[in-house]
């Protein structure tokens, strides 16, 4: 697959366009349909798994971003890229990200590595090699998982794309004027899920307070943090930011971020944030947007070829 530097189409001349175009207009037909499996977690909730199998002994596990799922174009594009290179693929939905709301009060968040652990443990028995890919929130989740687990079973390499390594920095950055539309879209979806969760568990939080918040930071402070055992948003961000786990990673891991990613801050885009791990490489491209790297001609996007090449090297 192509190994040259990423050059965006001339019409997609900035990070906003490189983010928005693939999110709205990229259409993906899977090379083979997903096969759905639902697994039960140790706490008696469920996770939905979506497989693409071809009797390979190499498996790629894909973790999606905030308010995403296995049907997002960036997930399916990455799935096709690896399936075409003889990998089996497993994409999964976090708690609350399927058509059916999950059973327990807890939902998903950037540090919920117990669920990624459950997915890896469920899949690993059939594969000699497992590779992890995470996008955005899923990138943070993947990196935190690796830092917690060290060298784990058959997990060989990982790739974290559009990784918000400092959650507080990323959250506050969404509350800037240029990111108003992104934050509004996220909040509309998050509030809808929170209302459904409140219908299940009316004592979980104050519904009136939910209707009065408008930022990701406030949502994390009111909903995400207390529901998942954190004191407040600051506590959640400090305990779950991937930057605090990178030096403990024990397998080859590639972080791929774009300098023009509208979701990432100069703090996140400073390579010093990655520390001095012998196992973590941090590549920053000048172009790409957030979970983007689009083109108009090739079926495989640059970031997808990048991940395939990294795993095969």
Language-model features: locations:
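Short beta-strand element of the alpha/beta-hydrolase
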Residues: 57-65
